């Protein structure tokens, strides 16, 4: 197990700027983090940026609120299977031969865990965007009109490549590449009026409005084999023998 694990080291950096005036305030912040997983070849780099803006005018009768955040993450997912095969692997067997080739016992469901991590790639990118804008207008002392719009967006793009020399999924396919992508978006729009009135012993609050929301999702998965070389990994899908022979 020691050959496929490590002491994970992580670091985080933050910076923020804020300011404004009596009618306007703002805050902008950024965050960077690098995280190493305890499994070799696992971890991620992430950058996150946020912006908040508020403004009021017309003697505070009209107020604007704007919030936005953007996150970009690059991940190395590694292979959890390496931990399982590290437990099953013969502890007295070598990891490699003298010529550098990986030792592999010809047994059912038994793979060299170090070879799994060294010969193959499993990584991905994720982007998230969140946006919200809100406007409040005090039409009367006890009547407020509000409009609110928000949107969330997420994109994932993952890639796997199993070497032509990897007994773990790659050898019997002449190299195996997998790509997966997905897009999700969510939109929300609301507009409403709020009436508030206080009486001697009670309060009356009435809200009337309209709300619309939309959720969309689409994804795509591709798996191809029979590659002439491992040099370009999953970036060389056009060279796949499966594709050239009409199998995909």
Region spans (language model):
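Surface-exposed loop/interface segments of Gram-negative outer-membrane beta-barrel transport/assembly proteins
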Residues: 1, 38-42, 48-130, 148-248
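Residues embedded in well-ordered regular secondary structure
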Residues: 1-40, 78-81, 115-123, 135-140
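Structural signature of outer-membrane beta-barrel channels/translocons
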Residues: 18-22, 54-58, 136-138, 142-144, ...
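Glycine/serine-rich loop-strand microenvironments at binding/catalytic pocket rims
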Residues: 23-26, 135-153, 167-169
């Amino acid at each position: 197990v020691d050959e496929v694990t490590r002491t994970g080291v992580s670091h985080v950096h933050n910076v923020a700027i804020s300011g404004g005036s009596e009618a306007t305030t703002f805050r902008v912040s950024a965050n960077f983090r690098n995280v190493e997983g305890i499994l070799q070849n696992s971890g991620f780099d992430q950058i996150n940026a946020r912006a908040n803006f508020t403004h009021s005018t017309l003697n505070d009768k009209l107020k604007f609120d704007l919030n936005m955040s953007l996150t970009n993450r690059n991940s190395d997912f590694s292979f959890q299977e390496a931990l399982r095969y590290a437990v099953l692997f013969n502890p007295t067997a070598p990891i490699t031969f003298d010529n550098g080739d990986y030792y592999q016992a010809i047994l059912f469901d038994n793979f060299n865990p170090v070879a799994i991590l060294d010969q193959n790639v499993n990584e991905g990118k994720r982007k998230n965007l969140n946006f919200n804008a809100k406007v409040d207008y005090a039409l009367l002392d006890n009547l407020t009109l509000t409009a609110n719009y928000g949107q969330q967006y997420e994109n994932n793009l993952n890639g796997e490549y199993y070497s032509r020399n990897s007994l773990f999924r790659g050898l019997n396919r002449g190299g195996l590449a997998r790509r997966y992508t997905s897009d999700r978006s969510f939109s929300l729009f609301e507009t409403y009026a709020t009436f508030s009135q206080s009486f001697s012993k009670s309060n009356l609050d009435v809200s009337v409005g309209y709300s619309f929301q939309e959720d969309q999702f689409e994804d795509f998965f591709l798996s191809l084999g029979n590659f002439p070389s491992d040099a370009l990994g999953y970036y060389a899908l056009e060279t796949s023998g499966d594709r050239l022979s009409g199998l995909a």
